[in-house]
């Protein structure tokens, strides 16, 4: 009996871990993503984030290297840039770093956060990147394009969001270039009101990038043909977590994280109990 129970839960857990390996990906509300907006705890996070960043560096050499590379570029470009009050070197470095090699691994960790929160080594990076976009946002909306090599499917019902930070371009030509798009993929045509034009920060300014936070919600979704999806946002946000890594974390966020970790532990304990 313990063996059957173990197999059942282990199978269920593995299914939760594997997404998008075959067939199209579902375009939904990204329920597994880490989507903190840090509302009401910015001051506490500004104090705590440098310590969290050191902890993340100790657990991820890749992040440490990417951060140092981005820091050099930020120090070179910041004298010629203007940025809002409260925007500091941590915010600038995080934004530059995202456009480099760390972006793919970071977004994977953000998307899969709920599946393995104990292995999330981007606590400070997520905060600094989120805060950078919040500070730079001026309320302007942008019409942008995002090409992917993966096919996405929309059920036809309900609002959607990306969950992860999402790179897009003002240029349709860039979005449809072979580097980002294939005939088997999806072309997103997006109206974003929370996305920020970050060309000046990017390692690749020719990409004309607009970076969209994962918590932006699109209430108007329309498909066209077999590989085009139109998304329209009326400046709406949605987050399942808030201030999780500050002492001001909401009860709901802490309970949610506790349940995720508890589920993982139960699966492991059931398997260990097998004779």
From Swiss-Prot:
Keywords on record: Cell membrane, Disulfide bond, Glycoprotein, Glycosyltransferase, GPI-anchor, Hydrolase, Lipoprotein, Membrane, NAD, NADP, Nucleotidyltransferase, Signal, Transferase
Glycosylation site residues: 58
Protein's GO biological process: NAD catabolic process
Residue numbers annotated as active site: 146, 167, 209
Residue sites binding NAD(+) per the record: 98, 146, 164, 202
Domain TR mART core residues, every copy: 61-238
Catalytic activity: L-arginyl-[protein] + NAD(+) = N(omega)-(ADP-D-ribosyl)-L-arginyl-[protein] + nicotinamide + H(+); NAD(+) + H2O = ADP-D-ribose + nicotinamide + H(+)
Tissue-specificity statement: Postthymic T-cells.
Family recorded in the similarity comment: Belongs to the Arg-specific ADP-ribosyltransferase family.
Designated name of the protein: T-cell ecto-ADP-ribosyltransferase 1
Protein species of origin: Rattus norvegicus (Rat)
